Swiss-Prot record:
F-type ATPases have 2 components, CF(1) - the catalytic core - and CF(0) - the membrane proton channel. CF(1) has five subunits: alpha(3), beta(3), gamma(1), delta(1), epsilon(1). CF(0) has three main subunits: a, b and c. GO terms for cellular component: plasma membrane; proton-transporting ATP synthase complex. HAMAP family: ATP_synth_epsil_bac. The keyword Transferase does not apply. Belongs to the ATPase epsilon chain family. Its main location: membrane. InterPro entries: ATP_F1_dsu/esu_C_sf (IPR036794), ATP_synth_F1_dsu/esu (IPR001469), ATP_synth_F1_dsu/esu_N (IPR020546), ATPsynth_dsu/esu_N (IPR036771). Keywords: ATP synthesis, Cell inner membrane, Cell membrane, CF(1), Hydrogen ion transport, Ion transport, Membrane, Transport. This is ATP synthase epsilon chain. Produces ATP from ADP in the presence of a proton gradient across the membrane. It is a peripheral membrane protein.
Length: 139
């Protein structure tokens, strides 16, 4: 099966580097499926899960808060603002953060409070979507 080199990097660390058969991510125009030999492409990433399909048929799922996806025919690079392996996401902490953001939104005192609360809600929604992908994979 054909493969391509994939690198998923955050500001803090390299999350994944190796051969993959496919990468699935949410770009600016919607969900993208990248296979070896894909036409060159650069797009902004939307917050949410990135699915990396490995040669052995297994799948890695990584949460990204946003960033850039660069595709070359045999190399795909994810430069993420924040990237966390989905297995390392703490669902209880995310639910607590969502609750806090909802309270902040309900008690907003300024447009800045509202913007911060909406950003936090969007981030927690993307993290919970990533957790759901992991749970679906396990079934």
């Amino acid at each position: 099966m054909a493969t391509m080199q994939c690198d998923v990097v955050s500001v803090k660390e390299s999350i994944y580097s190796g051969a993959v058969t496919m990468l699935i991510a949410k770009g600016a125009g919607g969900e993208l499926g990248i296979l070896p030999g894909h036409a060159p492409l650069v797009t902004l990433l939307q917050p949410g899960p990135i699915r990396v399909l490995l040669e052995n048929g297994t799948e890695e799922i990584v949460y990204v808060s946003g960033g850039v996806l660069e595709v070359q025919p045999h190399v795909v690079t994810v430069l993420a603002d924040t990237a966390i392996r989905a297995d390392n996401l703490d669902e209880a902490a995310i639910l607590e953060a969502r609750k806090n953001a909802e309270q902040l939104l309900a008690n907003q005192k300024s447009d800045l409070d509202s913007a911060a609360a909406l950003a936090a809600l969007a981030e927690t929604a993307a993290q919970l979507e990533t957790i759901r992908k992991i749970k679906n994979r396990a079934q």
